[in-house]
């Protein structure tokens, strides 16, 4: 029998994510909305918009909704039936609209879940700031709390490891000598100075490294590479090495096959489908390296259970209410 959960903990759950345009034609306004009106960025805007056109749009929102549906089913088995809303920073439905709609519908206490495995200003703090900016002006703002991060939690590690093992299986006998290459989104070095997340200054790269080490151990690999991808600009310093540069370096040393594992992403959206499956694949083919890409965690049951665990921790830890009294 499912144990009864604290019904007064939260009346709603908000999944907070990046977002993406569902059609290729919407790629340009989407990218421009991120980069802004800087004239120097126009060429890069058109270049990246072309990736969305090439793929016919981004599946990001659709895949996030699939995660929310799977999460709702898992939570229901635990006695948690609070409705789940999905809001995006860079595309419809925008966080400002979702938060306002939740408040208008009478929701009062919301648990936010940031869909990012590693914390930095752009992947964590910016999301929270966006939600706060949407919430504060409301006549009756939501009382917001966020679930904890989970970069080394078992569900994320196990789900990632399963996806990587499946990718190595594709290689057959070549798997033994294939390289395991982890990727995460490259970020500007100066962005670390803005980071407020975690107990250490900008935990993004240490968390990525810790995730990779744990996942590699679960896969049974003692050797692996850490790389970054999808650098948004040629200006300034960014986290390195770049995925394509590392492939070139390893190919020069005799590498013949590689499994790329985009553990910095939670679903197979454009940064994965284009920057890896098109660009990194092209680099591999040019150098005679067999390319295999592990799927992201998506709706893997272990990952969904992990999200549910983090939500349940908050629900069970919330004070129980009786009238105007808080029962501690």
Q: Across the structure, where does each feature detected by a protein language model lie?
A:
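Active-site-proximal alpha-helix that buttresses catalytic centers in soluble enzyme cores
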Residues: 2-328
């Amino acid at each position: 029998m499912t144990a009864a959960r604290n019904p007064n903990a939260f009346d709603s759950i908000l999944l907070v994510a990046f977002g993406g345009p569902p059609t290729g034609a919407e790629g340009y306004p989407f990218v421009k909305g991120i980069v802004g009106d800087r004239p120097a960025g126009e060429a890069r805007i058109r270049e990246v918009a072309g990736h969305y056109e090439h793929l016919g749009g981004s599946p990001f929102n659709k895949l996030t909704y699939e995660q929310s549906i799977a999460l709702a089913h898992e939570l229901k088995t635990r006695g948690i039936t609070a409705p789940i809303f999905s809001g995006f920073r860079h595309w419809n439905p925008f966080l400002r609209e979702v938060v306002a709609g939740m408040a208008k519908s009478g929701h009062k206490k919301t648990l936010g879940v940031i869909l990012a495995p590693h914390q930095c200003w752009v992947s964590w703090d910016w999301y929270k700031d966006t939600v706060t900016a949407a919430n504060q002006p409301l006549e009756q703002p939501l009382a917001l709390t966020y679930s904890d991060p989970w970069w080394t939690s078992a569900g994320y590690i196990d789900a990632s490891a399963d996806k990587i093992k499946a990718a190595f299986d594709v290689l057959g006998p070549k798997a033994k000598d294939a390289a395991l290459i982890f990727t995460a989104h490259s970020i500007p070095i100066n962005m670390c100075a803005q980071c407020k997340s975690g107990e250490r200054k900008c935990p993004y790269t240490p968390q990525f490294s810790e995730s990779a080490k744990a996942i590699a151990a679960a896969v049974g690999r003692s050797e692996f590479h850490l790389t970054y991808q999808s650098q948004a600009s040629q200006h300034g310093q960014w986290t390195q090495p770049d995925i394509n540069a590392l492939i070139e370096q390893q190919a020069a040393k005799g590498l013949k096959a590689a499994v790329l594992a985009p553990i910095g992403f939670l679903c197979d959206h454009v940064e994965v489908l284009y920057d890896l499956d098109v660009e990194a694949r092209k680099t591999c083919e040019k150098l005679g390296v067999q390319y295999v890409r592990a799927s992201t965690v998506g709706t893997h049951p272990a990952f969904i259970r992990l999200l549910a665990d983090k939500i349940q921790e908050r629900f069970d830890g919330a004070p129980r209410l009786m009238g105007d009294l808080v029962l501690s």
